[in-house]
Amino acid sequence: MSFVPTKVFFTKGVGRHKEYLSSFELALRDAKIEKCNLVTVSSIFPPKCERISVEEGIKLLTPGQITFAVMARNSTNEYNRLMAASIGVAIPADDTQYGYLSEHHPFGEDEEQSGEYAEDLAATMLATTLGIEFDPNKDWDEREGIYKMSGKIINSYNITQSAEGENGLWTTVISCAVLLP
């Protein structure tokens, strides 16, 4: 049986609770995907896959449904510890080719830093598969320009959730690309 997703939506959430597992559940609720049995998959953005809104995507979910997702997840119970969970996205100009989704789950990075890093990861993975020449030592802004000017990468972006740990509680952050039939 072959299953290639035709739709994707991006969501994120944060949860806090005295129990680790419950903080994850609350992050799933915040992201509006708690009713699914999530199966994490690796990082390919399928050819011809349409991005839809969270609201549209939620309507397509059924409680208990086996749902595939690329998920970045991070947790801490340390007071004031900054963490993030980011999904980076890179989409080729040719929609018959696949793109990339990257996961990044750091400590000590805010949303902007983490998101930019995840986006860079996805775009660099795509650039290397497309044969785009670039200097890996250049900063992201320079490489982003090279990638997009090549005409082979049409878009890159990220979805990121960050939070700081609260005293006495587990804090969990998630970012997900939810893949649908």
Swiss-Prot record:
**What UniProt keywords apply to this chain's record, in alphabetical order?**
Decarboxylase, Lyase, Pyruvate
Q: Which residues cross the membrane?
A: none
Q: Which residues carry this modification: Pyruvic acid (Ser)?
A: 43
Entry-linked InterPro entries: Pyr-dep_his/arg-deCO2ase, Pyr-dep_his/arg-deCO2ase_sand, Pyruvoyl-dep_arg_deCO2ase
Q: Indicate whether Lyase appears among the record's keywords.
A: yes
> What does the entry comment about cofactor binding?
Binds 1 pyruvoyl group covalently per subunit.
Which family is this protein grouped under? Answer: Belongs to the PdaD family.
What is the name attached to this protein's record? Probable pyruvoyl-dependent arginine decarboxylase
- Per the UniProt record, the source organism is Chlorobium phaeovibrioides (strain DSM 265 / 1930)
